């Protein structure tokens, strides 16, 4: 039983990131890599446990220096997130105004707001395509600029 409990405790430690398909654009000693990512974590709110799941794309800039690939930059493009009760008898406070948060990361914004953490509404996300397009343009320019 103690082993099971230890494994159960480990399940609730911090957020997890699962990285899926990776796309790479290579130009000599530089590359841009985009990775589809799912992030999930458990949160206890008002006596109920919720699973927060988020989907994003991680955009890495990497460069080969002296034969070693090194990360030069990392950006995250948020797609969407959700929170679901771990058991079906839990529910959300219907007074929560989720509309005040951006669609691509409204649940994590709610958790930050609730915890008094400042929320950045200008992160790249699928609900603000101009920010995403600017990020890709900057990565493309970096990739195609010689040293």
Task: State where each predicted segment sits.
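A solvent-exposed, acidic/Ser-Thr-rich amphipathic alpha-helical stretch
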Residues: 1-39
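A hydrophobic membrane-anchoring alpha-helix module
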Residues: 91-147
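Flexible, membrane-facing loop/turn or short amphipathic-helix motifs
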Residues: 42-48
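Short beta-strand edge/turn micro-motifs at domain boundaries
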Residues: 32-34, 55-88
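Intrinsically disordered, low-complexity regions enriched in Ser/Pro/Gly/Gln/His and often acidic
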Residues: 48, 62-65, 135
């Amino acid at each position: 039983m103690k082993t099971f409990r230890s494994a159960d405790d480990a399940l609730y430690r911090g957020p997890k990131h699962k990285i899926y398909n990776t796309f790479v654009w290579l130009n000599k000693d530089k590359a841009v890599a985009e990775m589809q990512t799912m992030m999930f974590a458990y949160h206890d709110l008002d006596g109920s446990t919720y699973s927060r799941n988020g989907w994003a794309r991680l955009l890495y800039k990497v460069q080969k220096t002296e034969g070693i690939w090194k990360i030069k930059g990392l950006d995250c493009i948020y797609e969407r997130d959700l929170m679901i009760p771990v058991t079906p008898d839990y529910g959300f406070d219907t007074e929560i105004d989720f509309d005040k948060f951006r669609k691509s990361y409204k649940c994590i914004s709610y958790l930050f707001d609730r915890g008094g953490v400042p929320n950045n509404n200008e992160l790249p996300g699928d609900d603000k395509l101009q920010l995403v397009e600017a990020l890709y343009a900057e990565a493309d320019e970096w990739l195609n600029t010689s040293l």
